[in-house]
């Protein structure tokens, strides 16, 4: 994407503010014309004062009055443009930031798993700030500066083409110098932004794992790593700053050289009667004005160039396409009963190896279907397809007889509740976390859901529903977080429930409490359970055994054990361990009883 096309897109993002942008552009055109008038009037006044008649008038007062009028107009118009440009840029920055935030929340989990959240935050804030600066600078002064140059050069030719040549030479030098520096530093600035991204990601990574950093005494190491990246950033930034500092120095030198050149040529032309003192003064003012405007144009180009890497990153994220979206004819499904059908469903992440292949099964309303198999067998993919994290490449999934692709994502996901392996909580109050399931839930409804999820006791003990859960729920224990997520699912009251290893990370005592809560939330719902611990799915209506993306066995727990297949091997392995543990416990108890009996004997 070239600098021009990049900036065109920046202006396209004005959206609803584009009409105000056009009005500001017109106001800038008027400002450019009025700024050109001032040096002309100044020159005419000098000519009159030096005894030369101008336009048939020997009085300077009419020119002075016109100058005052143009000055007042310029002041008023500049103030209005600055005020409206400020408001436009601030309003649109907030609008774009909100749109970006909504966009990244809709991107697939595969995108988020491969992109650091700290980088996404950095891209969002840096990108919207870059847009704000460019909009503000463009409408406040840069567009007026560009128009001033466009207006001034041809009119200076009309007034005195000999002196105007010097102004054209000045523009050519500026253009050549700016083009050279932009090309020279383009790659350098890209490297600078890469270092900024690395710096942001590294800092975010360390701050997100403070407990790990402190427990493994990694503070100094992490600081040293960040310092190393910061030093690399400075090394990459310094050459860019040096080149643009050179532009500034040459710009200032050009002011002096151009003014001296105009005076030198002007005196020579005056001696030959080819110009007046007023015209010399006029062109000195032109040169000063032109250099001022060229500096603003160079500043504009520099700003676009410096912001380009940030904007490219921003647009790259903005251009990322959500994996799924609503069809134009998608309908609101309303409240579903929970009949789920998979028919010959095949899906591949990379287009080569299928994650699930020819998957077919039916879950009736109220049934519990367990998905069992090794990691990577396709269990989580099947569930992801159910709530349309992705769409299958072939086959279809129906709920209550409706293809899930034919209903809106909002209505589909409103009918599905998920209890994750790791309870996901916001750094907000317990009440706000519960209301994720039902935004308009009353306190009475939250209390009832918490009680059913066996969470009310610890909520009241910790200070009530307004207690903050901490970042990612760290103010609560693992079991408390999980019971909150179950209460959240109860509040949502979906007809379809997904339990993704909901108790695998809990201790035995906590697991008993959570399982009791899960029994409550599963009642009367179509439930899909992803499980490795087979004891948790003993009472499932149906168990699907996954291997390499296919269902290789299907049936109840007892039926699958009786078949003697892969599931039976898993069951024997897990329950043999449990039986051995119980046997060891019984042996320990027996030994203790024997010792106690012997001690009592005379």
Curated annotation (Swiss-Prot):
Catalytic activity line of the entry: [(1->2)-beta-D-glucosyl](n)(in) + ATP + H2O = [(1->2)-beta-D-glucosyl](n)(out) + ADP + phosphate + H(+)
GO molecular function: ABC-type beta-glucan transporter activity; ATP binding; ATP hydrolysis activity; ATPase-coupled lipid transmembrane transporter activity
PROSITE patterns: ABC_TM1F, ABC_TRANSPORTER_1, ABC_TRANSPORTER_2, NDVA
ABC transporter domain ranges (all copies): 340-573
Chain positions recorded as ATP binding sites: 373-380
EC top class, as a word: translocase
Family under the similarity heading: Belongs to the ABC transporter superfamily. Beta-(1-->2)glucan exporter (TC 3.A.1.108.1) family.
Name recorded for this polypeptide: Beta-(1-->2)glucan export ATP-binding/permease protein NdvA
Organism taxonomic ancestry: Bacteria, Pseudomonadati, Pseudomonadota, Alphaproteobacteria, Hyphomicrobiales
Gene: ndvA
């Amino acid at each position: 994407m070239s600098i021009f096309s990049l900036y065109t897109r920046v202006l396209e993002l004005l959206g609803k503010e584009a009409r105000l942008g056009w009005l500001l552009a017109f106001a800038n055109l008027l400002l450019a014309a009025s700024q050109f008038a001032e040096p002309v009037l100044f020159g005419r006044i000098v000519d009159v004062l030096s005894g030369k008649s101008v336009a048939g008038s020997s009085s300077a007062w009419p020119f002075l009055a016109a100058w005052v009028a143009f000055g007042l107009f310029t002041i008023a118009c500049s103030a209005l443009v600055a005020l409206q440009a400020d408001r436009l840029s601030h309003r649109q920055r907030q609008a774009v930031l909100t749109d970006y935030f909504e966009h990244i929340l809709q991107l697939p989990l595969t995108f988020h798993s491969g992109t650091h959240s700290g980088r996404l935050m950095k891209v969002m804030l840096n990108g919207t700030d870059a847009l704000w600066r460019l909009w503000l600078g463009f409408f406040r002064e840069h567009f007026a500066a560009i128009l001033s140059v466009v207006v001034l050069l041809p009119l200076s030719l009309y007034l005195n083409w000999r002196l105007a040549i010097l102004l054209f030479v000045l523009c050519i030098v500026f253009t050549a110098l700016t083009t050279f520096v932009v090309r020279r530093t383009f790659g350098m600035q890209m490297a600078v932004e890469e270092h900024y991204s690395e710096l942001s990601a590294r800092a975010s990574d360390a701050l997100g794992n403070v407990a790990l950093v402190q427990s493994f005494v990694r503070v100094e190491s992490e600081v040293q790593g960040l310092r190393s990246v910061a030093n690399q950033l400075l090394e990459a930034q310094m050459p860019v700053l040096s080149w643009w500092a050179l532009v500034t120095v040459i710009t200032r030198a050009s002011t002096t050289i151009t003014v001296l050149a105009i005076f030198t040529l002007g005196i020579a032309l005056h001696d030959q009667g080819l110009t007046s003192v007023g015209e010399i003064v006029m062109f000195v003012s032109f040169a000063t004005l032109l250099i001022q405007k060229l500096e603003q144009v160079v500043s504009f180009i520099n700003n676009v160039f410096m912001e380009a890497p940030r904007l490219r990153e921003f647009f790259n994220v903005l251009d990322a396409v959500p994996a799924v979206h609503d069809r134009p004819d998608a309908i609101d499904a309303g409240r579903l009963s929970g009949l789920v059908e998979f028919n010959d469903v095949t899906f591949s992440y990379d287009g080569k190896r299928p994650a699930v292949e020819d998957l077919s099964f039916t879950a009736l309303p109220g049934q519990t279907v367990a998905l069992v198999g090794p990691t990577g067998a396709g269990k989580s993919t099947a569930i992801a397809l159910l709530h349309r994290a992705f769409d299958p490449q072939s086959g279809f999934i129906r709920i209550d007889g409706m293809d899930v692709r034919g209903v809106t994502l909002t209505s589909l996901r409103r009918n599905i509740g998920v209890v994750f392996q790791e309870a996901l909580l916001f750094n907000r109050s317990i009440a706000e976390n519960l209301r994720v399931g039902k935004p308009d839930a009353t306190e009475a409804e939250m209390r009832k859901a918490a009680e059913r999820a066996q969470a009310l006791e610890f909520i009241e003990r910790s200070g009530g529903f307004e207690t903050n859960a901490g970042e990612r729920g760290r103010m609560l224990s693992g079991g408390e977080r999980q019971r909150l997520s179950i209460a959240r699912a109860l509040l949502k009251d979906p007809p379809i429930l997904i339990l993704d290893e909901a108790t695998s990370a809990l201790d035995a005592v906590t697991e008993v409490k959570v399982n009791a809560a899960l029994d409550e939330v599963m009642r009367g719902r179509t439930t899909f359970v992803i499980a490795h611990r087979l004891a948790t799915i003993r009472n499932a209506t149906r168990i699907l055994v996954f291997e390499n993306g296919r269902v290789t066995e299907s049936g109840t727990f007892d039926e699958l054990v009786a078949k003697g297949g892969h599931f039976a091997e898993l069951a024997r392995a897990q329950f043999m361990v449990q039986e051995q543990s119980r046997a060891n416990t019984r042996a320990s108890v027996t030994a203790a009883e024997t010792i106690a009996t012997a001690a009592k004997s005379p």
